Amino acid sequence: METILSSCLYDPNLKTKFYIPRFTHRLLIAHAWGITPGQKILDIGCGQGESCLVLAHLVGRTGHITGIDIAQPEYGSPYTVKESHDYVRKSELGSRITFLRSDTPSFLRDLHRPAREVFDSVALFHSLWYFPNSQSVYDLFRTLAVDAQAPRVYLCEYSYEISLEEQNVHALAAQTQRLFYRYRRPRAPGDLEQNVRAGLDQASILEAARGAGYRVVRDGKVTPDPSFLEGHFEVQYVEGEKFMRRVKEEALTEAQESEILASLARLREVHEEWKRAGHETVRNLDIWWAVLELGA
């Protein structure tokens, strides 16, 4: 853990509350996938590189991680994507990681050879909820299967199927963001994009993967420890002024705005009930993970 933390740019005041639970969760998922030394992995939607650090730690000196993302260099807070990547490059794990700003089709085209000759697997580490719509997820799996011929895909994402009643608050926050993103005008991602965009559920993601020719060889679910606060932060965002301002500035139809505000009102109602019961933080949704392989 210390090797990973020392390779990450973060606020030391948030080490215990935020970063240790975050990396502990990512290590748990990567171990469930079965990441082993020597692997060459393409990490799609790598963001600021936290997933790359975990994967680089597990693949060792003989492995390598290539992280790609379309995010603007200025995206991210309190540290931007550019600041985070620059820090990682100079760290102990930096030699095992390559960062590139690119979409998947462009990256694969620029390889000038089949991706299967360069990478033995692809990772989608909490990145699919960031995709703008369901078609983009279907297109991704088709690209991975046909163009890249990627033999193995590791994926994980939040599950809307709650196992604990107290996870309902996070689910409502995610669904409210997804609803807004469905109605907003299509445009290129900006510096302040929300985390939940298309927010596809497990069945839709697996339908896209299977339609492209992938099969599930191993899967499971993880209920995060209460110290894992991603869901809590999502609720804070949706209930905050920034989200409301974005809804108002989008010039939606009256019906669309009313639907979003009704979803937000339901979120606040359930969250207030949760707080009256004596709880200060929100329980995170379960995470489902899978290992997919191409072919029969």
From Swiss-Prot:
A Gene Ontology molecular function term for this protein is: methyltransferase activity
Q: Which UniProt keywords apply?
A: Methyltransferase, S-adenosyl-L-methionine, Transferase
- Methyltransferase domain: where is this region? 37-142
Pathway membership of this protein? Mycotoxin biosynthesis
**What's the Enzyme Commission number for this chain?**
2.1.1.-
Any idea what a deletion of this gene does? Impairs the production of ustiloxin B but accumulates intermediates such as ustiloxin F and C.
Query: What is the top-level taxon of the source organism?
Result: Eukaryota
Going by the record, the broad EC class of this enzyme is transferase
Q: Name one GO biological process term.
A: methylation
One short Pfam family name for this protein? Answer: Methyltransf_31
- Gene3D superfamilies xref list: Vaccinia Virus protein VP39
Family, as annotated: Belongs to the class I-like SAM-binding methyltransferase superfamily. Erg6/SMT family.
Q: What does the protein in this record do?
A: Methyltransferase; part of the gene cluster that mediates the biosynthesis of the secondary metabolite ustiloxin B, an antimitotic tetrapeptide. First, ustA is processed by the subtilisin-like endoprotease Kex2 that is outside the ustiloxin B gene cluster, at the C-terminal side of Arg-Lys, after transfer to Golgi apparatus through the endoplasmic reticulum (ER). Cleavage by KEX2 generates 16 peptides YAIG-I to YAIG-XVI.
The name this protein goes by in its record: Methyltransferase ustM
- Give the species this sequence originates from: Aspergillus flavus (strain ATCC 200026 / FGSC A1120 / IAM 13836 / NRRL 3357 / JCM 12722 / SRRC 167)
- Name the encoding gene, please: ustM
